From Swiss-Prot:
GO-annotated molecular function: protein-N-terminal asparagine amidohydrolase activity; protein-N-terminal glutamine amidohydrolase activity
Reactions that this protein is recorded to catalyse: N-terminal L-glutaminyl-[protein] + H2O = N-terminal L-glutamyl-[protein] + NH4(+)
Quaternary state and interactors: Monomer.
Enzyme class: hydrolase
EC number annotated for this UniProt entry: 3.5.1.122
Function: Mediates the side-chain deamidation of N-terminal glutamine residues to glutamate, an important step in N-end rule pathway of protein degradation. Conversion of the resulting N-terminal glutamine to glutamate renders the protein susceptible to arginylation, polyubiquitination and degradation as specified by the N-end rule. Does not act on substrates with internal or C-terminal glutamine and does not act on non-glutamine residues in any position.
Designated name of the protein: Protein N-terminal glutamine amidohydrolase
GO CC, any one term: nucleus
Active-site residues (renumbered): C20, H74, D90
Keywords from the UniProt entry: Hydrolase
Length: 205
């Protein structure tokens, strides 16, 4: 894969296990700081559904040869500089970092056709600049009833917006018309962000 990557190495990225929404926020922040001209081509993508049971393959936390795991939600970063050059940066995948959109979707989500309806995946796609402004989390979802942490939090302070203390649920929600960005089914997501390099090529006769 040859391209001018926004993030040269995965080791250059802020990462804390089980805080994917914050990891992606940090990627957006890094682009704004180092490559601001590319920010308008970047997105934060939440994956979930009504029951918050979404199977993903090729995940570091997955089991078996296929490395499949069922998350309540997941978040990854996309850079879409050209119609057929969309790249996915997922800090939790076992695929390369980054991976071209088509390969990532094919190996990570496969198809909804073989899944029960309650496991179908939906995608909330949020422009990176919107995500930087509107995302806010006090990390309450990672605390047990006694106040202890389910997983250790990042060492930096919580990411809080000026208007909301905790709005993570609005991003995980897959109801159209609610929350920032746009919500797609798996097929709609592919139709919107995958453009075959052969589409639109005219041949001389």
């Amino acid at each position: 894969m040859t391209t001018d990557f926004l993030f040269p190495k995965i080791a250059d990225c802020s990462y804390v296990s089980c805080y994917c929404e914050e990891n992606v926020w940090k990627l957006c922040e890094q682009v704004k700081r180092t490559r601001p001209e590319e920010l308008s081509k970047c997105y934060a993508v939440f994956v979930s559904n009504e029951g918050r049971t979404v199977p993903l393959w090729r995940q570091k936390a997955g089991r078996g040869d296929d490395q499949v795991v069922i998350w309540d939600y997941h978040v990854f970063f996309m850079h879409n500089p050209l119609p057929n050059r969309c790249l996915v940066f997922d800090l939790d995948t076992t695929l390369p970092f980054p991976t071209y959109f088509h390969k990532y979707v094919t190996e990570t989500f496969r198809s909804d056709l073989a899944l029960r309806p309650e496991h179908h995946r939906f995608f909330r796609v949020i422009p990176a600049d919107t995500y930087l402004i509107e995302f806010s989390s006090d990390r309450r979802h990672m605390r047990r009833p006694d106040g202890s942490w389910i997983k250790p939090p990042p060492s930096y302070p919580p990411i809080l917006s000026n208007t909301n203390l905790h709005c993570l649920g609005d991003f995980i929600c897959m109801s159209a018309g609610k929350g920032p960005g746009a919500v797609y089914s798996l097929s709609e997501f592919v139709q919107n962000f995958y453009k075959s390099p052969h589409v639109g090529v005219q041949q001389n006769k």
